[in-house]
Amino acid sequence: MSSYLFTSESVSEGHPDKIADQISDAVLDEILKQDPKARVACETYVKTGMALVGGEITTSAWVDIENLTRKVICDIGYEHSEMGFDGHSCAVLNAIGKQSADINQGVDRENPLDQGAGDQGIMFGYATNETDVLMPAAITYAHRLMEKQAEVRKSGKLAWLRPDAKSQVTLKYEDNKIVGVDAVVLSTQHSEEVSQKDLHEGVMEEIIKPVLPSEWLSKETKFFINPTGRFVIGGPMGDCGLTGRKIIVDTYGGAARHGGGAFSGKDPSKVDRSAAYAARYVAKNIVAAGLADRCEIQLSYAIGVADPTSIMVETFGTGKVANELLVSLVREFFDLRPYGLIKMLDLIQPIYRETAAYGHFGREQFPWEKVDRAEDLRVAAGLK
């Protein structure tokens, strides 16, 4: 019998890097509302008392960058100097320029179906049947812990919580099946006055226990709640934040490979983002069809070229049909050209700010989480 541990982490919407991601995606959403053909690459930097928004944007839209940035920061919960960061009073600097014409000529075409990829690169998508959302369990529960932290903070149930937090979940596997939780780490920013006893009790009873399956917890499970003891200084006052610094949190928590490209602040013509979403869509439909228990897709592109330069399917020995057949089915049922996948997943809509915290995958409200091709794949593979 083989046994092993696997760990994934998540961070809250108030983590400095996630503040930056949410600002970048809020800018993208506001532009897409006005100009569906916009080209957006928006980067944000946050530090004590300031937010810098920059990047390359080509659009006919007008967005009030300063007020939008302040609103995002306040919505997260940084709206008073006691938090160490205040959306009402921080400086907001705008350093946005235009996209290079050299890139534009490779992307835009008279026939939209010939639209080239905005850059070269590799992208991965993954799915596994170990959770109901066909995502790895460790990252799924790490995200849910962070969502719960925000819920009880914003509702006032634990009024001493502050926006910055991190979680980490270590699961025990035997013969590739989860048998329990080995360890949970949860660090959360808090107000000055709360005692360590009240903090530990509140986090355990209101965040950890309601989220993790009780049958996975035992007297051997280790809990590390604010293990340094004090976490008053947090958010951008504690660390600077940058767009695109949490790419493993954003995806599969290390359970699958990553092509290296970040998502937030990029419009769907950037295959770093849109092709990674399409790869997840393909992998999830293959698993939902029962063609594999685990599936990883790799796509690659060349700048200015429409068709992917490669498609790879890996099922880790769990496939019900040959990987070569799966590759041919992917080519048959999924249009993975940049314009094709944008149409397939309806990506020209203002949905991106919501992706920028708690993971881009495993959340049913996003179009790349549909399993509408599963039945067709199953029939075509000869399993029905």
Swiss-Prot record:
E.C. designation(s): 2.5.1.6
UniProt KW ATP-binding keyword: yes
Pfam families, A to Z: S-AdoMet_synt_C, S-AdoMet_synt_M, S-AdoMet_synt_N
Subcellular location: Cytoplasm
Species of the source: Haemophilus influenzae (strain PittGG)
Biological function: Catalyzes the formation of S-adenosylmethionine (AdoMet) from methionine and ATP. The overall synthetic reaction is composed of two sequential steps, AdoMet formation and the subsequent tripolyphosphate hydrolysis which occurs prior to release of AdoMet from the enzyme.
Keywords for this protein: ATP-binding, Cytoplasm, Magnesium, Metal-binding, Nucleotide-binding, One-carbon metabolism, Potassium, Transferase
Gene: metK
GO cellular component, one term: cytoplasm
Uppermost EC category: transferase
MF-aspect GO terms: ATP binding; magnesium ion binding; methionine adenosyltransferase activity
Cofactor binding remark: Binds 2 divalent ions per subunit. Binds 1 potassium ion per subunit.
One GO biological process term: S-adenosylmethionine biosynthetic process
Predominant subcellular localization, coarse grouping: cytoplasm
Taxonomic placement: Bacteria, Pseudomonadati, Pseudomonadota, Gammaproteobacteria, Pasteurellales
HAMAP family according to UniProt: S_AdoMet_synth1
Binding site for L-methionine: E56, Q99, D239, K270
Name under which the protein is recorded: S-adenosylmethionine synthase
Binding site for Mg(2+): D17
Record-stated family: Belongs to the AdoMet synthase family.
